[in-house]
A protein has these predicted regions:
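C-terminal amphipathic/interface module of NAD(P)-dependent oxidoreductases
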Residues: 146-184
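Glycine/proline-rich active-site loop of Rossmann-fold NAD(P)-dependent oxidoreductases
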Residues: 4, 23-24, 36-38, 49-58, ...
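Glycine-rich "substrate-gating" loop/helix at the edge of Rossmann-like oxidoreductase active sites
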Residues: 14-19, 46-52, 73-83, 94
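Alpha-helical membrane-targeting segments
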Residues: 58-80, 122-151
Length: 184
């Protein structure tokens, strides 16, 4: 859940927002598996970046028309991950029998929404200046708006402790790869 600038590892207590409640219920539903002595892993995925669907795809259009910007204040944290790292991390967890319990699948370098917007603008050669007001997001998305207005500063601590290496640990390298925009 939203805890401002607090770094949230897998050991952090859950929040009380929509996404936190959903995660608690989802993970509780697997308690029987663990009680039976079967290894299980719960994946707490960050926003998986894709230029063709999901959050990134929706962000691209306003940036391409020079009207991109942060959601609300822009101070909320964004836990994100490149799809190649998401797949590699899942495979890593399958192949490492000592892995069990919850794992944050997100890049080790989270950004605020405003910082992510500036990086996206830089990669696209576009400004990041026009914020989307929080009230408009709440009106359009209802309770789900909390997922973009509150965010989490999540860190994949357990994954890092097991030795997983991210191919795209920072947003700029991830976005350049996904959008076909190599550094010039």
């Amino acid at each position: 859940g939203n805890r401002g600038d607090e770094i949230l590892t897998e050991a952090a207590a859950p929040g009380a927002d929509f996404l936190a409640r959903l995660t608690v219920e989802w993970e509780a539903s697997t308690a029987g598996v663990a009680a039976a002595g079967v290894r299980h892993v719960s994946i707490r995925s960050g926003v998986v970046l894709s230029p063709t669907e999901g959050a990134l795809a929706r962000l691209l259009l306003p940036y391409r028309f020079f009207v991109g910007g942060p959601f609300g204040s822009g101070r909320q944290w964004l836990a994100w991950i490149h799809p190649a790292d998401e797949v590699a991390a899942i495979r890593f967890l399958i192949e490492h029998p000592q892995a069990s319990g919850p794992f944050n699948l997100c890049a080790p370098q989270p950004l605020t929404n405003a910082e992510f917007g500036r990086v996206l603008g830089r990669v696209l050669g576009r400004p990041s200046w026009l914020p989307v007001p929080a009230f408009a997001l709440r009106l359009a998305l209802g309770e789900v708006a909390s997922t973009v207005l509150e965010g989490q500063r999540a860190i994949p601590q357990k994954l890092l402790d097991l030795g997983f290496r991210f191919r795209f640990p920072d947003a700029e390298s991830a976005l350049r790869d996904l959008l076909g925009r190599p550094r010039t």
